[in-house]
């Protein structure tokens, strides 16, 4: 594992502009009187890419993470030939998130959701004892399961039974990853409802979805 120093950042309420420190797993501004997202403000104004050895964390200057996790892979940008020729373009570049070894892309879940999962899970305190809860209908569940399994981060997935075929992996998962399912005929909203029932216990905490700055910054 390469040496890593987390970048300094603060959080800002989009509605009010109030800037405040991240207390660890802040998902909103407690002082804001209206619904609003929060966003990150990084001390480094210029993104300095690290070497490819850092995997996804080559972008760490603009990620709200505490540490680097194992087995991360970065998106790959390459100059298009076939599509560029079809469109009559000379300088078309494509950024690819997935599995395509021929161009150096090795995200084994074949999904851009890996970038979100590696960002969110690296924001978690290493001493966190509670179980992370994620509701998903497919790709997000697969990505979080892979990242949490590889790094032994306790995870509870809530997935509709009809979407279980989306949970394929290239190997067995660590027992730290658990699964609950809404019954057949249910959908994503049923999975969310089921996850919210688990969150009534103080042994669990919500990933947060779009409210989690690490989710959005990881995808950017």
Place the predicted regions along the sequence by residue.
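PLP-dependent amino-acid enzyme catalytic core
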Residues: 1-220
């Amino acid at each position: 594992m390469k040496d890593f120093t987390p970048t300094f950042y603060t959080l800002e309420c989009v509605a009010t502009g109030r800037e405040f420190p991240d207390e660890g797993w802040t998902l909103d501004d407690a002082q804001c009187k209206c619904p609003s997202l929060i966003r990150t403000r990084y001390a480094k104004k210029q993104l300095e890419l690290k070497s490819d050895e850092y995997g996804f964390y080559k972008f760490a200057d603009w990620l709200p993470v505490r540490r680097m996790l194992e087995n991360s892979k970065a998106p790959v940008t390459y100059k298009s030939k076939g599509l560029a020729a079809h469109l009559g373009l000379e300088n078309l570049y494509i950024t690819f998130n997935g599995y395509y070894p021929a161009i150096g892309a090795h995200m084994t879940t074949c999904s851009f959701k890996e970038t979100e999962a590696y960002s969110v899970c690296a924001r978690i305190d290493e001493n966190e004892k509670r179980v992370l809860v994620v509701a998903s209908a497919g790709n997000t569940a697969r990505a979080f399961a892979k990242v949490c399994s590889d790094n032994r981060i306790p995870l509870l997935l809530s997935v509709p039974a009809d979407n279980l075929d989306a949970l394929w992996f290239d190997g067995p998962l660590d027992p730290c990853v658990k699964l609950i399912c809404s019954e057949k005929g249910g959908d994503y909203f049923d999975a969310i409802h089921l996850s919210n029932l688990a969150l009534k216990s103080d042994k669990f905490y919500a990933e947060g979805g779009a409210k989690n700055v690490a989710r959005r910054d990881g995808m950017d």
